[in-house]
């Protein structure tokens, strides 16, 4: 009977860009890869397994993160990107056969790069980002305000659990940055507030397109710009056109899990 090897897996330290916490992650083993393969059936299941895979990879974590739920509540989506990068880097390192479509001639070609050569990070240095929120008035829907925040993994888990179907997934994810929408009457009186997720989605769908773009511009300026980027300069193999390519970390992570 197999009783286990005495193996010390490679480790990598990650400082999360938005909550500024230090974690040491270890590389995946084959069993964990197999679990991830089995999870890729529904978005909710894949998301849950990915979160647990990252959490289980921690060799060292902050004292304030005692449980899995505590980690979900104290980790932003942008922080998870950084932790996933650390897990990817220590497990696979190379980004192999990444398909790029040229913006000039529109032909596809494959490239291989080291993940570390594409990495850059901008940290949030203005205190506790998780409990911060701000109101912004919408430019077209006058007197309507959106309260914007940086969503956590817990927010995402709750939204996925309550979604109305796979077709709703994109809009559930899209509206995680909105804590509530409310309208203040011009004549005074109480505001009409929509803070339940389904009400937020219905209200969001009624907004003008310019209002939607305004919400995301404000989110990016206050929160979204803080995180990691995986960018590389690439030259088209067909026409020689050079352009900056942004790498899809989650998609590439699952692609590597499925490769031999």
Describe the residue ranges of each PLM region.
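Short, surface-exposed, charged amphipathic helix/loop patches that serve as local interaction elements
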Residues: 1-260
């Amino acid at each position: 009977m197999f009783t286990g090897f005495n193996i010390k897996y490679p480790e990598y330290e990650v400082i999360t860009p938005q909550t500024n916490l230090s974690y040491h992650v270890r590389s995946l083993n084959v069993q964990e890869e197999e679990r991830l393969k089995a999870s890729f059936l529904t978005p909710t299941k894949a998301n849950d397994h990915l979160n647990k895979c990252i959490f289980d990879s921690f060799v060292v974590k902050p004292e304030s993160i005692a449980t899995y739920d505590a980690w979900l509540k104290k980790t932003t989506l942008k922080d998870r990107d950084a932790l996933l990068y650390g897990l990817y880097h220590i497990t696979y390192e190379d980004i192999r056969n990444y398909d790029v479509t040229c913006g000039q001639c529109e032909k596809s070609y494959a490239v291989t790069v080291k993940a570390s050569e594409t990495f850059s990070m901008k940290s949030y240095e203005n205190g506790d980002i998780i409990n911060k929120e701000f109101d912004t008035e919408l430019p077209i829907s006058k007197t309507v305000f959106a309260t914007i925040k940086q969503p956590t993994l817990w927010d995402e888990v709750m939204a996925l659990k309550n979604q109305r179907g796979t077709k709703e997934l994109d809009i559930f994810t899209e509206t995680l940055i909105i804590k509530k929408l409310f309208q203040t009457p011009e004549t005074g009186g109480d505001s009409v507030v929509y803070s339940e997720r389904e009400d937020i989605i219905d209200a969001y769908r009624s907004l003008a397109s310019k209002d939607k773009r305004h919400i995301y511009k404000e989110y990016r300026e206050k929160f979204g710009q803080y995180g990691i980027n995986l960018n590389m300069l690439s030259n088209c193999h067909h026409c020689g056109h050079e352009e900056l390519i942004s790498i899809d970390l989650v998609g590439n992570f699952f692609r590597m899990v499925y490769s031999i």
